[in-house]
């Protein structure tokens, strides 16, 4: 299975390193539309959503990602990637990809200094607690009818799935746990 990490900004290397630990996965750093269109799954990493959103448009990557979504290729957005996938962003008129029926609040847990780690119980992902790293993290304020809530932290939605789309407010790539990767890769079957 050919799994790409959008290679324009953010935690690209960390996602690539995790994918390389999983048997049968060809990890690809996807920096152009031609590479994107060859993928069986795509991860949109954390970083700075405004900068990544601009790059998506300026380099024609947005259209390629929209084509992947039309083909129901699994797409997973972590932190900024989740913001890019959202149909609605609170207090922000921009809509980057707009492919997932969620409304997100950017930097909902505060600034960089307010970043934190916690442990979450997410039965759909693992029977064990999962470490979750939140860095200037967003959260999901509301979801549409077809969206499955996977995890909450202090009453706020921090992970969700809609068909082939997965979104996490936190960074599984910054932990030693591969549970979210295995769950995401099963969306392709």
Curated annotation (Swiss-Prot):
Organism, scientific name: Caldanaerobacter subterraneus subsp. tengcongensis (strain DSM 15242 / JCM 11007 / NBRC 100824 / MB4) (Thermoanaerobacter tengcongensis)
Record's subunit section: In the presence of PdxS, forms a dodecamer of heterodimers. Only shows activity in the heterodimer.
Active-site positions on this chain: 79 (nucleophile), 171 (charge relay system), 173 (charge relay system)
Gene of this entry: pdxT
PROSITE patterns listed in its UniProt record: PDXT_SNO_1, PDXT_SNO_2
Pathway given in the UniProt record: Cofactor biosynthesis; pyridoxal 5'-phosphate biosynthesis
Protein name: Pyridoxal 5'-phosphate synthase subunit PdxT
Entry keywords, A to Z: Glutamine amidotransferase, Hydrolase, Lyase, Pyridoxal phosphate
An example Gene Ontology molecular-function term: glutaminase activity
């Amino acid at each position: 299975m050919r799994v790409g990490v959008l290679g324009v900004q953010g935690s690209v290397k960390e996602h690539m390193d995790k994918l390389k630990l999983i048997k049968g996965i060809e990890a690809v750093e996807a920096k152009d539309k031609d590479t994107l269109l060859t993928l069986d799954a795509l991860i949109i990493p954390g970083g700075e959503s405004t900068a990544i959103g601009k790059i998506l448009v300026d380099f024609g990557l947005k259209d390629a990602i929209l084509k992947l979504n039309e083909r129901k290729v699994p797409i997973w957005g972590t932190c900024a990637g989740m913001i890019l996938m959202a149909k609605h962003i609170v207090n922000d008129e921009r809509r980057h990809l707009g492919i997932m029926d969620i409304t997100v609040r950017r930097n909902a847990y505060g600034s960089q200094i307010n970043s934190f780690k916690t442990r979450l119980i997410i039965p759909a992902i693992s029977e064990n607690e999962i470490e979750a790293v939140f860095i200037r993290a967003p959260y999901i304020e509301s979801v549409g009818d077809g969206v499955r809530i996977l995890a909450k932290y202090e009453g706020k939605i921090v992970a969700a799935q809609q068909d082939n789309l997965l979104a996490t407010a936190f960074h599984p790539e910054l932990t030693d746990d591969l549970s979210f990767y295995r769950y995401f890769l099963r969306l392709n079957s």
